[in-house]
Every structure is written in C-alpha cells, then in structure tokens.
Amino acid sequence: RTSRSITKKPINKEIAKVEANLFCKLKKIVAMSHKDKLLLEQMNYKGVIEVADLGVQKVGEVLNGIPIEEVVDKFKDRKNLIFFGYMKRAENHWSIIWFIFFVFLKIRKQNPHIHLWILGLAPRPLLKLIGKCISNVHVAGAVSDPTLAFQKADLSVAPLLYGAGVKIKVLQMLEAGATVVATEVGAEGIESHKKLHIVNKTQFGKKILELLD
C-alpha cells in the first residue's frame, strides 16, 4: 500500500528493509502467487519459496452467519451474481457501490431477472440502504460459508477498482467451480484460468451479459 500512496512513499524503502530483514529469518515462505514469489526473490530472500496451489486458501466461514442455504434457496428462476468480501474494507465497499450504479443498473434493464447478492462481514449502513432501495440487490451480510453460493450462482464478480495483492476470495471462487468476471485489480497475481474473465471496467457489464446469454 505504501508504494501506491504519495504521502507514504518516502517511508516505503524503510518498510521494505524491515520486511527483508524479517524474511531472512525464515527458512521457508508459502506465497499466494508467482507474482509474490518474484517479489520475494527481488528482495534477495534465499530460503525456499513455494506457491500455494489453487484451492488451499479459504476465507469467509462465519459460525454465526446466515446459513448459506437460505441464500441459495432464493436463486430459483433468477440469474444470480455473487460478490463476496469483507465489506468494511474500503476497496470492497466502494467497488461494489460503483458496480451497482454503473454496471448492475444498466444490465438489469436488459435482463430484469438478474439479481446481485453481496455476501460478507460488516456491510456499511450506506450499502444496506442501497440494498433496501434498489430492487434485485441483496445485501446478505455474513454467511456460514460462501462456497455453495459460488457453486450455484450463474457468475461471481470481482469488480475491484483499487487495492493490492492476490484476492484469496477469487481463488476460492475458482476452486468452487465458479465462472468469475474480474477487473485487472480483482485478478491481480492470479494465474490464467479458463473460468476467469479479466476485463476493463468499461466492458464489465457487456461481459456479464455475454456470459449469461
């Protein structure tokens, strides 16, 4: 994050030094992507670096969340899109709001049966209000385990506009067998996959309609 912030750039080199010193104390590191592996090598890490296999990462299980079956039961006779993430994070919150107003409302006009399900902890009040005011937008909040929703929905989406690093949720979607439409930010660091469609944000809605057709 510091490398992308104008105000924090001056301390970026110092942070990199601290990270490199910490890494040198480790004999082995499991990286989330080949991109992360390359970054470690560029930092002169001399230990063993392994890249985690697709599917070993898993996030989103919440013991007191809504049973995912309650969400999936409502999928019948609809075209369903899934967005999943920790909704308190700014990049998730603002990216899905952008998606709703600049993509979803447009594609809903062409296909009134499209529904958007937003899963994940701590949705902000603004997002909850949008979910109440805009038809076909469902802000479910925390769920027991999103995997079944990934499997049963027509598409999963990762329309992230900013944020750094590999998105474990996208790896989890793919492992569940979902077809995923993502921006370059949403797919950052993820190896090519036959079910991962990476598009410019201006083409996001077009790709969704194409895949649903």
Locate each region found by the language model.
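Conserved catalytic-core segment of nucleotide-activated headgroup transferases in glycan assembly
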Residues: Q42, A52-S135, V139-Q151
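Alpha-helix capping/helix-boundary segments
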Residues: K35-L39, P123-R124, G186-A187
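Donor nucleotide-sugar binding/catalytic pocket of nucleotide-sugar-dependent glycosyltransferases
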Residues: K8-A16, A20, C24-V71
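Short acidic/histidine- and often glycine-rich active-site loop of Leloir-type glycosyltransferases
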Residues: E184-I198
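Acidic donor-binding loop of glycosyltransferase active sites
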Residues: K27, Q151-G165, A176-T179
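Acceptor-binding helix/loop patch of EC 2.4 sugar-transfer enzymes
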Residues: R1-K17, K76, V185
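C-terminal "capping" alpha-helix adjacent to the active site of nucleotide-linked donor transferases
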Residues: K194-D213
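Short hydrophobic beta-strand element within catalytic cores of glycosyltransferases
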Residues: K169-Q172, T179-T183
